[in-house]
């Protein structure tokens, strides 16, 4: 799924460098070393590679971005609520997730969370997009609206799900519940006749 970021850069003629990893392998400091101090301005990463189950080291990536003053955009669709992720503590500029996966609602809503510096960046630029104009979304959000009619039913389900998570002890409790489910699943499949490809 990380390749989709590459496709987006290609479609919009954005100069980019792809760090292509072998399937199932994690990102290491050695992968990042050649890019230290090279003037990169943005780092796009999916926190968890859904197809292989590899969870990337977001602390490693965050530290690299801070050292190099790089804007960090994290796709956490398949890890949101399933793995610990503190956007503010990590200094992540933009976090993308969806209504499905661990949020456990039907697919159909994309959620983009902007840190204050990301809001400032969006508002200071001319945006040439009708249906994906974050400046319009922010402006409409000030009055509790969206630029276009959203999937209202799914928004109501997200609202109910967030209340459910809060009542059950909050995000940390949900992370622990997911970790227990994952450990149980891994234990039950470890003797089955197949190979797990992730490191």
Model features per residue range: what roles?
Residues 10, 66, 190:
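Anion (oxyanion) recognition and catalysis
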Residues 100-184:
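Active-site C-terminal subdomain of aminotransferase-like
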Residues 88-100:
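Conserved active-site segment immediately N-terminal to the catalytic lysine
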């Amino acid at each position: 799924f990380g390749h989709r970021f590459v496709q987006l850069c290609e479609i919009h003629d954005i100069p980019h460098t792809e760090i292509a990893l072998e399937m199932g392998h994690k990102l290491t400091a050695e992968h990042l070393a050649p890019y230290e101090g090279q003037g990169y301005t943005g780092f796009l990463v999916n926190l968890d590679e859904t197809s292989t189950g590899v969870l990337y080291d977001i602390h490693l990536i965050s530290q690299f971005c801070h050292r190099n003053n790089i804007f960090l955009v994290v796709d956490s669709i398949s890890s949101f609520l399933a793995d610990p992720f503190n956007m503010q503590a990590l200094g992540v500029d933009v976090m993308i997730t969806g209504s499905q996966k661990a949020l456990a609602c039907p697919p159909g809503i994309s959620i983009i969370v902007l840190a204050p510096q990301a809001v400032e960046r969006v508002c200071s630029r001319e945006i040439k997009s009708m249906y994906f104009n974050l400046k319009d979304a922010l402006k409409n959000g000030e009055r509790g609206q969206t630029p276009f009619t959203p999937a209202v039913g799914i928004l109501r389900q997200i609202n109910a799900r967030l209340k459910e998570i809060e009542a059950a002890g909050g995000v940390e409790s949900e992370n622990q519940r997911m970790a227990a489910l994952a450990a149980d699943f891994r234990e039950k499949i470890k003797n089955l006749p197949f190979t797990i490809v992730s490191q």
